Amino acid sequence: MGADRDESAGPVELLIEGPKPKTQGSMRAFPFRRRDGSLGVRVTHDGGRQVEDWRLAVRLIARQQWQRPPTRGPVKLAVLIRVPRPKSHYRRSGLSAQGRRQRRPGRLAGDVDKLLRAVCDALTGIVYEDDAQVVEALVRKVWAEDRDGTWRTAIWIAPAED
């Protein structure tokens, strides 16, 4: 076992119900000239407040479930996003033909790489010290089985094997 591995760390599952997962885009830098003539740089994130709210929801659940200091070893993540189906996918008798044809959610839930970026940033400082410790990740978007319209995101965190 590696010296950085936390021997007590086993797999942990986080379940976030309710808020729609938000994608975190890239940071953008805008140069500007200050009043004194020097050059400054303003950095913004794509997504803004909505991404902050989503990351806060992930952080709150992570703090409740992760009952130990941040690990210093490699970590693997799996993220499963259950997307509520639109009402147009249903008829009285169950799924409509359109609902049966659409096997996976498309753009509705966002890009998986940007969803993962938001989750990784939210877990920094709680689960691990730096999101560079994530050495393996899987993200899936699937249709929710129930009809209650609730977004559900499950995040599994486990130490990565050397």
Annotate each predicted stretch with a short phrase:
Residues 1-162:
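Acidic, proline/glycine-enriched N-terminal capping motif
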